């Protein structure tokens, strides 16, 4: 499966930077999943678990982070998550 570059950033630093098959989060409009080559998107994040699904065959299936709200931007096969706070779930 194709991958997309993912950046998970908080005011204290970058918690994740790497390739993923999918990113799942809750926005102001509901739950959404971003795959490779997703159309451009900008939205607000709700406080909710964020899932980063690793490429097939990578160690571990997915990462989960409890995010405390923020923003998500998708463009040029890249997902950038800017959040107030995030901790591994």
Language model region names:
Residues 1-3:
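Short, charged, intrinsically disordered terminal tails
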Residues 5-89:
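Compact, glycine-rich, soluble single-domain proteins
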């Amino acid at each position: 499966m194709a991958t997309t570059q993912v950046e998970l950033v908080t005011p204290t630093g970058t918690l994740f930077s790497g390739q993923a098959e999918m990113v799942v989060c809750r926005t102001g409009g509901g739950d959404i999943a971003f795959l490779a080559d997703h159309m451009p998107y900008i939205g607000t994040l709700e406080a909710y678990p964020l899932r980063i699904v690793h490429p097939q065959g990578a160690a571990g299936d997915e990462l989960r982070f409890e995010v405390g709200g923020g923003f998500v931007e998708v463009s040029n096969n890249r997902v950038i998550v800017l959040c107030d706070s995030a901790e591994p779930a």
